[in-house]
């Protein structure tokens, strides 16, 4: 029950941040439509974009789940759908073929 509450809080925080980012993008777009001849965005729009980007980045890092270590032995014993790549002879011999081509060029 607690994990669903925590996930709901994370989702609500992220949705709030996405709506703030959307508002910032909209206000920047409206400002660009009414832009003066010098072609520069107003300072408040620039500050708003920087602030929202930093807020989104830090909040995402804070509410993210902890990183898990990669366990090679867990994954190495499972069958991979990409196993056919290891059976391609040209793929395995690319270094050898490259050396032959360079010898022919010289």
Curated annotation (Swiss-Prot):
It is found in: Endoplasmic reticulum membrane. Keywords: Endoplasmic reticulum, Membrane, Transmembrane, Transmembrane helix. One of its GO terms (biological process) is protein insertion into ER membrane. The lineage of its organism: Eukaryota, Fungi, Dikarya, Ascomycota, Taphrinomycotina. Coiled coil: none annotated. It is a multi-pass membrane protein. Residues 1-12, 68-106 are cytoplasmic. The keyword Transmembrane applies. Residues 34-46 are lumenal. Pfam families: MMgT. The keyword Membrane applies. This is ER membrane protein complex subunit 5. Its main location: endoplasmic reticulum. Component of the ER membrane protein complex (EMC). GO terms for cellular component: EMC complex. The chain crosses the membrane at residues 13-33, 47-67. The EMC seems to be required for efficient folding of proteins in the endoplasmic reticulum (ER). It comes from Schizosaccharomyces pombe (strain 972 / ATCC 24843). Belongs to the membrane magnesium transporter (TC 1.A.67) family.
